[in-house]
Swiss-Prot record:
One annotated GO molecular function: tRNA binding
EC number annotated for this UniProt entry: 2.7.7.72
Protein's name in the database: CCA-adding enzyme
One of the GO BP terms on file: RNA repair
UniProt keyword list: ATP-binding, Magnesium, Metal-binding, Nucleotide-binding, Nucleotidyltransferase, RNA repair, RNA-binding, Transferase, tRNA processing
Catalytic activity entry: a tRNA precursor + 2 CTP + ATP = a tRNA with a 3' CCA end + 3 diphosphate; a tRNA with a 3' CCA end + 2 CTP + ATP = a tRNA with a 3' CCACCA end + 3 diphosphate
Lineage, top ranks: Bacteria, Pseudomonadati, Pseudomonadota, Gammaproteobacteria, Enterobacterales
């Protein structure tokens, strides 16, 4: 029996990146032997075992043979005679097809170390064709490693463009899993840009793909030209401001359904936005996006464009936004609102000082309204539904008074 550290841990160690998890491959052993020495089997499709103490995953070396379509049409073969080189051959990218033996020696049969030096994402073999999920994985690695200069090898990208016909065979869970991982990278927009370029976006995310055909109606980012590019820019912006998966996904969806409003008329009411909300619902249901993310996405969508220039908002609208985001019960939500505002202003025609001005307006406006407490209303003799009505009325009065002074002072 021989043990090898494989996959992302090897790649990240060579890139001097943090190692978040370790995966191991065992050669010269069998499932029966692994069980007999205390490992717990967890893999259904192929033998994967948990170490009895570290609980790290150990897989028996295996080869794969494609029999059907999609990513599930594989027959896995394990036996003690399979070598580590054979196991690494089935992997997607050369940078993921390296291993360390237990003496710390690097095994690199497919030149992964060279591609690390070249900063290239290159497929290991033509077996890459056999798994359509690899299109998403390569796009995700392009997003993950963008900051350190990685790009996709030309020949690998060409293969990806010829694989898109099999993408429909992917389960929603697998698509969401890769997308979720991509969204929490430093450059999530790269994931969608790669999918767009290779033709996968129109198959997996047609709601996003159509945005690249819709001209942008504002001159604030005149170089972006269309709503698809605008969405990518704002996704990049929010990623500089927040690591939160839910808010990044919400910003990704901020322009969905724009093709249903060709005249670009302001849509203020929920009834006017129902067709667009239904597109968000359909996308999230198809991908099986968690309900908490769906809920936030719809709230952000409702008020996203209002938050472009908060100096133009009425006090009533500011109160409505605070209520929609449940700020008084969850005060940290005000920072979320500010980040949504900033994600639209970064890189625009506005000076950076104006960005901070809007942030100050939102933050201070909220703080002013929090000075009015429910207990103050109760102590004034109000009860029942009258409490919330009076609380709203007083907060609105305070906000109007403060906002007038604030804007007058800044002029």
């Amino acid at each position: 029996m021989k043990k090898y550290l494989v996959g992302g841990a090897v790649r990240d160690s060579l890139l001097n990146l943090p190692i978040t998890e370790k995966d191991w491959v065992i050669t010269g052993s069998s499932a029966q032997e692994m069980l007999s020495i205390g490992y717990e089997q967890v893999g259904k499709d192929f033998p994967v075992f948990l170490h009895p103490k570290s609980h790290e995953e150990y897989a028996l070396a295996r080869t794969e043979r494609k029999l059907g379509s999609g990513y599930t049409g594989f027959i896995c073969h394990t036996e003690p005679s399979i070598t580590i080189e054979e196991d690494l051959y089935r992997r997607d990218l050369t940078i993921n097809a390296m291993a360390y033996d237990m003496n710390g020696n690097l095994l690199d049969p497919y030149n992964g170390q060279k591609d690390i030096q070249l900063r290239l994402l290159r497929h290991v073999s033509n077996a890459f064709y056999e798994d359509p999920l690899r299109v998403l994985r390569v796009a995700r690695f392009a997003a993950k490693l963008k900051n350190i200069g990685f790009t996709i090898a030309i020949e690998t990208f060409e293969i990806m463009t010829h694989m898109i016909h099999e993408l429909k065979s992917l389960s929603p869970e697998r698509v969401w899993m890769e997308t979720k991982k991509a969204l929490i990278t430093d450059n999530p927009q790269v994931y969608f840009q790669v999918l767009k370029k290779c033709g996968a976006l129109k198959i997996l995310f047609p709601e996003l793909d159509i945005l690249f055909t819709i001209p942008q109606c504002t001159t604030h980012h005149s170089n972006l030209m269309n709503l698809g590019n605008q969405t990518m820019t704002r996704l990049s912006n929010i990623s500089c401001l927040s690591n939160d998966l839910a808010i990044r996904y919400a910003i990704l969806c901020c322009n969905l359904g724009s093709e249903m409003n060709p005249r670009k008329q302001p849509l203020k009411q929920l009834t006017q936005k129902k067709p667009q909300i239904s597109i968000i619902n359909n996308l999230c249901n198809r991908l099986k996006v968690p309900n908490n993310i769906l809920k936030l996405t719809k709230i952000v969508f409702m008020y996203y464009h209002d938050l472009y220039d908060v100096t133009k908002l009425s006090s009533e609208m500011i109160m409505t936004i605070f209520q929609a985001f449940d700020c008084w019960r969850t005060p940290t939500r005000i920072e979320l609102i500010i980040k949504i505002n900033q994600s639209q202003l970064l890189g625009s025609k506005f000076h950076i000082n104006y960005l901070f001005f809007q942030s100050t307006l939102l933050r201070t406006a909220f703080n002013e309204t929090t000075q009015i407490k429910a207990n103050d209303i109760i102590n004034s003799g109000f009860s029942g539904i009258n409490i919330s009505q009076e609380l709203y009325s007083r907060r609105l009065h305070v906000l109007k008074h403060w906002k007038n002074k604030f804007l007058t002072h800044k002029q």
